[in-house]
Amino acid sequence: MPTADFHQGEYVGEHFKARKFITGFSGSYGTAVIAKDDAGLWTDGRYFTQALTEMEGSGVRLMKMFVDDTPSTTEWLAQKIPEGGKVAFDGRVLSMGEGQEYEEVLGAKNITIEYEVDLIDQIWEDRPSLSKKPCFFLEDKYTGENVASKLKRVREKMAEYGATVHLIASLDDNAWLLNFRGDDIDFFPLVLDYVIVRKDSVDLYIDDSKLNDRIREEMAKNNVNIHPYNDIYEDAKKIGADEVALIDPMKMNYALYKSLPCKVVEGANPTILMKAIKNAVEIENIKNAELKDSIALTKFIYWVKKNYDKMEITELSASDKLTALRAEQEGYIRDSFEPLQAFGEHAAMMHYAPSKETDVVLKEGGMLLSDTGGGYYEGSTDITRTTVPVSYTHLTLPTIA
């Protein structure tokens, strides 16, 4: 059970937090493996302390990645599972590359892999449903390039690979390609979907209740056919044997890869480099987003310094205040990630986010570490600053005559 959804995203919606459900660990990165007589949680140094605290008494052991001789999940399974045994996982939440590694390593011990089973779903009685939040279209004044132009460029790259179809499962690539955004994952303007680009058409797999008339209009104009979200797996099996599919092994889930009956060409999604090179409109928009965020943060620092000794300001209330100041800026959508407001000793903890249980009051003599960001129509920001609550307005320094 990795930290992933069907699209290999590290940050996922509530429906996909199976690892948290089974282990109690809520960090953004980690993989749980459950055996008959043992269980382990693999994560990196950012989360060792958090994992030990949250998993206390759970029976799940912390496996410290990149420390000493800690085995990888694959190595651990190969050691743990006897010859001729069986390993089961939901192939939709494992990457194609991970699945192939399991095939190679476990296959050497004649271990069977069952990748079309979601055991957590069978025991998670109140599992949250998939998000149904609406999408919105991002106009040319924000993107600087329309859908038709982007599809043309992708098809040119497909031709270089000799591909007749291109399957895209990564949400950021699909959002960039079709110029719409969603709200299926907290703090990220993404929507759960798959895309198949063909020579003359596009198939979009999505919950169409999320689409507004503007998006439907743009999709129709670009010959984008809309299908139910989960139909992708059966439709992938229907791709002709004479077709050539371009897929990105780092961005494609294992189950979808196994559904393909045609020849496969592996390569990075062309959209990755395309969206990395910003056009003039995007560059100007990024500057505007950063200016808006700077205004909000400057107001926040001033507010902390002026009010920490006049009212009770805590880590959580500081987070709320900064979010409110960002919301005053035109074009604000949401925070770009969970606000990390850490005061005093909390500032020494990597990726500390305050909660009702850990929240503390800001006092003179300590330091507030603010690691936050804002999401705007023009772009997203990520900024870290330290603020020291003090009651004086100037410093007197000793001088040497």
Question: Model segments located where?
Answer:
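N-terminal accessory/capping or targeting/presequence segment of soluble
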Residues: M1-P82, K86, L94, E98-K237, ...
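Short, Lys/Arg- and Gly-enriched loop/turn segments at beta-strand edges
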Residues: E10, Y376-I383
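Generic, well-ordered alpha-helical scaffold segments in large soluble proteins
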Residues: K80, V105, K157, Y161, ...
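Terminal amphipathic helices with adjacent charged low-complexity linkers/tails
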Residues: E114-Y115, D121-I123, V264-N285
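Flexible inter-domain linker/hinge segments
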Residues: I123-A163, A169, I277, K287, ...
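Conserved small/polar residues in nucleotide/adenosyl-binding loops
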Residues: T393-T399
